[in-house]
C-alpha cells in the first residue's frame, strides 16, 4: 500500500515536471526540473524502489 502511494506520487511529480518543461522558456527552469527529478530518484532509491522508469523520463527530458 505504501509503495503504491509512493509510486503514484512519483508519477504525479513526473507529470508536473513534464508539464513544466513543456511550457518552459528558459534553461534554468529545465535544470531545476531535472534537479527535482534526480532528487526524487535518490529518495526512491533509498526506499528500495526501482527507478528504471524515471531514467526513461530523464532521457526524454534531455
From Swiss-Prot:
Signal peptide bounds: 1-24
Keywords assigned by UniProt, alphabetized: Antimicrobial, Secreted, Signal
Tissues where this protein is expressed: Expressed by the venom gland.
GO cellular component, one term: extracellular region
Residue ranges of the TM segments: none
Locations listed in the record: Secreted
Family affiliation: Belongs to the formicidae venom precursor-01 superfamily.
Its job: May have antimicrobial properties, like most ant linear peptides.
Protein name: U-myrmeciitoxin(01)-Mg3a
Organism: Myrmecia gulosa
Amino acid at each position: 500500500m505504501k509503495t503504491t502511494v509512493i509510486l503514484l506520487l512519483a508519477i504525479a511529480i513526473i507529470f508536473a515536471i513534464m508539464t513544466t518543461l513543456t511550457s518552459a522558456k528558459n534553461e534554468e527552469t529545465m535544470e531545476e526540473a531535472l534537479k527535482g527529478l534526480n532528487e526524487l530518484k535518490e529518495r526512491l532509491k533509498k526506499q528500495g524502489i526501482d527507478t528504471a522508469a524515471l531514467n526513461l523520463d530523464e532521457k526524454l527530458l534531455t
